[in-house]
Amino acid sequence: DLVRSRGLGDVYKRQTYSRVEKYESISDRMEIEIANYLTCVAEGRLSSEGKEEIRIMLRAVSEIESIADSCNNMARSIKRRNEFKSIFTDEQNHNVDQMLALTEKALHRMIEILKKSELVRDDVNPSYNIENEINNYRNQLKIHNVEDINNKKYQYQDGVYYMDIIGEAEKLGDYVLNVVQAVIEKKI
């Protein structure tokens, strides 16, 4: 909704952005609390396997917080685009929707992995496939963005805002894959 700003009121857009900022701040605090707790646990008498598990959990917590950072960065890019009254073409909106659908698919897969009590190494493969789709789509959109600017389909600055959102969505996919890798490493 925040991306397609044509029909949305400014109050709604500000409220949505404020909510994203609020949850990112909560995520920051949770990361610190969890990391502090795990660090205290690691200072105790643990086997080398226990210490390795703590290291993996710290990595997962950090990557989950990076997902929140990425969502906040994406919201900030959208806010900046809206403040400068940049409006995306229907094709750009469609492409953003497609990219967000891929990142949502990656997030759903991550949640599936987090819920599983037992995993095998091959459980990571669908996440790699989704990440490859995200990377390939981002690369394709970068090429088309340059072509569309050259063909005067939209202004250069509109293309910058557009690629900021696409690039941040791709980073979000990276962080999601990192969480999946850490969780699978811990559970197998």
Q: What is the predicted function of each stretch?
A:
Residues S5-I188:
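Cytosolic, long alpha-helical scaffolding segments
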